[in-house]
């Protein structure tokens, strides 16, 4: 693959030109055009499908992050590339993490970090059963479930697990505990540059086996301390996510039945 500047200084192989085109359109932050062109190339190309999928993942996540639901809430399901409310399957989360470059493969497309932050923010909320239930209830009206240009035709969702239909339209302020839904309505939820307690920390994570269940383990560790050193392995990255310093490590899965979890 190529990086932006290097690609302009060397001769591009014919098979790389469609990918370079997708790269340049995405670099201009025209996410919808980049997604359209990438989808067309993916359908027409007989090779390089994995690389097109990496670009599509970034486009889908950032389009969803920029397009609100009709009631003003963030499209958190769109930000994890699900088409509608339902069970958040760990194997789908693992697939998206790999496309975003958190596994054994890299993603050289622009805005990979921004897409990762949006993805982790939405995942952190939807992986909390209590907040997910409130969010599903707030977005259960059929009007709120109409596609807003965020549908990803390549993601399969378990239709038997869809929930929240038939509850009728509801205002967020009418919901019990509706103050938590402000998490889904923040205009710029990430990144948070300030240290210390942030607005997004009004609720805590629960240890309910967040993460993929097969292949590599994604271990998310919150580092509440502010200045001390973090022990970083070669497969770890340190990010500010949800207002905290977070170390994310990709570990090789062992021959065991242990399930990865998210710990504070």
UniProtKB/Swiss-Prot annotation:
It comes from Arabidopsis thaliana. Disruption phenotype: Suppressor of the triploid seed abortion phenotype observed in osd1 and jas-3 mutants, thus leading to enlarged and somewhat fertile triploid seeds production characterized by abnormally normalized parental imprinted genes expression. InterPro entries: Imprinting_Balance_Reg. This is Protein ADMETOS. The gene is ADM. Product of a dosage-sensitive gene that contributes to the maintenance of paternally and maternally imprinted gene expression in the endosperm in order to balance parental contributions. Underlies postzygotic reproductive isolation by promoting triploid seed arrest in a genetic dosage-dependent manner, thus being a component of postzygotic interploidy hybridization barriers. Paternally imprinted expression in the endosperm. GO terms for cellular component: nucleus. GO terms for biological process: endosperm development. PANTHER family: CHAPERONE DNAJ-DOMAIN SUPERFAMILY PROTEIN, PROTEIN ADMETOS. In Greek mythology, 'Admetos' was one of Jason's companions Argonauts in his quest for the Golden Fleece. Product of a paternally expressed imprinted gene (PEG). It comes from the Eukaryota.
């Amino acid at each position: 693959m190529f990086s932006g500047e290097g690609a302009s200084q060397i001769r591009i192989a014919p098979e790389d030109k469609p990918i370079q085109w997708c790269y340049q359109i995405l670099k201009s932050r025209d996410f919808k055009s980049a997604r359209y062109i990438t989808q067309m190339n993916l359908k027409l190309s007989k090779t390089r499908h994995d690389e097109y999928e990496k670009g599509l993942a970034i486009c889908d996540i950032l389009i969803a992050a920029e397009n609100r639901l009709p009631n003003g809430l963030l499209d958190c399901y769109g930000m994890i590339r699900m088409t509608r409310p339902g069970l958040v399957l760990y194997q789908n989360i693992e697939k998206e993490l790999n496309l975003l470059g958190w596994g054994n493969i890299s993603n050289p497309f622009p805005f990979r970090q921004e897409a990762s932050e949006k993805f982790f923010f939405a995942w952190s909320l939807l992986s909390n059963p209590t907040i997910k239930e409130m969010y599903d209830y707030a977005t259960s009206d059929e009007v709120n479930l109409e596609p807003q240009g965020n549908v990803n035709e390549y993601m399969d969702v378990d239709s038997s697990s869809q929930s929240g239909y038939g509850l009728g339209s509801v205002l967020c302020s009418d919901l019990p505990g509706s103050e938590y839904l402000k998490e889904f309505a923040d205009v710029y939820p990430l990144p948070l540059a300030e240290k210390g307690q942030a607005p997004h920390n009004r609720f805590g994570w629960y240890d309910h086996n967040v993460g993929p269940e097969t292949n590599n383990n994604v271990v998310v560790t919150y580092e509440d301390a502010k200045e001390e050193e973090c022990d970083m392995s070669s497969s770890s990255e340190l990010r500010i996510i949800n207002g905290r310093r977070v170390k994310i490590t990709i570990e090789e899965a062992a021959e065991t039945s242990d399930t990865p979890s998210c710990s504070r």
